[in-house]
Regions:
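C-terminal motif of bacterial Sec signal peptides marking the signal peptidase cleavage site
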Residues: 17-20
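Early extracytoplasmic/lumenal segment of secretory-pathway proteins
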Residues: 35-124
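A structural signal for short loop-to-beta-strand junctions that line the ligand-binding cleft
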Residues: 47-50, 106, 110-119, 132-171, ...
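Periplasmic solute-binding protein
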Residues: 77, 119-132, 149-150, 154-183, ...
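Short beta-strand->loop
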Residues: 132-143, 161, 277-289, 298-301
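Ligand-binding pocket segment of bilobal, Venus flytrap-like solute-binding proteins
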Residues: 200-204, 208, 212, 220-284
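Mature extracytoplasmic/periplasmic domains
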Residues: 298-359
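Conserved C-terminal helix/tail region of periplasmic/extracytoplasmic solute-binding proteins
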Residues: 355-422
Length: 422
């Protein structure tokens, strides 16, 4: 939605300029393209020349589809622009969940210089010394981060992270097959048997448990064993209804109409609405998770100063806007927010009002080791419940098939014997 608005505005500006010219023939195709294209201006170009010619490279580990790649005409390729400006090569790879990121770093099998985990995972990594303090002298563009995103609970002294995006979780659905009025849609639709095998569910424990906890009236940060078990039972109850537990696949399946209903992050939902006009997105009134993803440097990083330069680059106003315009998530960056059109700034999905945030949202905190362990065990139990269901049905079906085969053989022999007699 935002990308389409941006391009339309650029096109209108180009047309207006063309109409104002007495001789439109002097406008070349290159000039028209320049009018439509996003441009990059940095505040201190000399700052970015410190490592030129040194052959440095940084390893960046980020969520999929979470940076402007220049794939859309007229948009910036953020990593390519950084490489061109600094001479530092960016090795860029993706992960699908916070848990995947954590496992990769904890296992020590790879070295990364920049990561972008979510709030609760940042808190966990700080506790386990997996991320290191930042030198904010190397990140002057931190000045653009809005005050209400500084010193968050997951990084109280703001030593380890720079906010990148934020958003809420809601429900995306196909309006051509879901016949429930939008204002009545809530999390219980993910348990609605009318949509058997057409529902997708998150394939990570924290997000999935959160939805069950909201339905049961619990805090998203509960550590009570009875409540965690009740949430797990709720997810097990859902197993026979859902088509599958997925993450990135939600985008393709919903866009193609291969599923009808799924929980989804608001930014990704706004992007997918561009591809399928039948889809709708709603943030349930019963409550939701508000998440913040922030940029950190792991303790294993080999190029800390170059990584801080990359973080500062992501906070350049033109870059911050290009990213937000492309991925459609909400921004904590004051200059990027001012560059958005008024419609987007007032969009209740992208920027819900303060009352909704205060009363209907909850930010994840890092749970205790004991609670994390119990949730993971319950999650594993829930996931294995699918196999148990298969086994429970497989045995009777196999038995019936076996009996039928035996009866068939006996009938065949009986008929054959009768033929032999006559």
């Amino acid at each position: 939605m935002k990308r389409r608005i941006y391009k339309a505005a650029a096109l209108l500006a180009a047309l207006a300029l063309l109409c104002s010219c007495n001789n439109s023939e002097i406008e070349t195709e290159e000039e028209e393209e320049e009018l439509e294209a996003q441009t990059l201006t940095v505040e201190d170009e000399e700052y970015y020349t410190r490592f030129k010619g040194q052959g440095l490279s940084i390893n960046v580990y980020n969520w999929g589809e979470y940076i402007c790649t220049g794939a859309d005409e007229g948009t910036l390729n953020v990593n390519a622009e950084f490489e061109k400006l600094t001479g530092i090569k960016v090795n860029y790879t993706n992960y699908a969940t916070n848990e995947e990121l954590y496992a990769k770093l904890k296992g020590g099998g790879a070295t990364y210089d920049v990561i972008i985990p979510s709030d609760y995972m940042i808190s966990k990594m700080i506790k386990e010394d997996m991320v290191q303090p930042l030198n904010f002298d190397n990140i002057p563009n931190f000045k653009y981060i809005m005050d209400n995103f500084r010193n968050p609970d997951y990084d109280k002294e703001n030593l380890y992270s720079v906010p990148y995006t934020w958003g809420t979780v809601g429900i995306i659905y196909d309006s051509t097959v879901v016949d429930i009025p939008e204002e009545e849609i809530d999390w219980d639709i993910l348990w609605n048997e009318d949509y058997l095998d057409q529902i997708l569910m998150f394939d990570n424990p924290r997000d999935a448990f959160a939805i069950a906890e909201i339905m049961l009236g619990y805090s998203l940060n509960t550590e009570d064993s009875e409540e965690l078990n009740a949430a797990a039972d709720k997810l097990i109850e859902q197993k026979r209804i859902v088509q599958g537990h997925v993450m990135d696949e939600i985008f393709d399946k919903m866009a193609a109409g291969d599923a009808w209903i799924a929980p989804y992050y608001a930014g990704d939902a706004l992007t997918i609405l561009e591809q399928n006009e039948d889809l709708r997105f709603v943030v349930p009134e019963s409550g939701t998770n508000l998440f913040i993803d922030a940029i950190c440097i792991p303790t294993c990083a080999k190029q800390k100063e170059a990584a801080e330069m990359y973080i500062n680059f992501l906070c350049e106003p033109d870059i911050a806007f290009a990213n937000i315009d492309y991925i459609c998530y909400s921004t904590p960056h004051s200059a990027a927010f001012e560059m958005l059109d008024e419609e987007t700034q007032q969009d209740p999905v992208s920027y819900p009002d303060e009352e909704f945030i205060a009363e209907k949202t909850e930010i994840f905190v890092n749970l205790s080791d004991e609670a994390n362990r119990e949730m993971q065990e319950l999650w594993t139990k829930m996931k294995s419940a699918e196999d148990e269901n298969v086994n429970r049905w497989f045995a009777p079906v196999f038995l019936v098939a076996g009996i039928a085969a035996i009866i068939g053989i006996l009938i065949y022999r009986y008929i054959k014997n009768k033929k032999d007699i006559f």
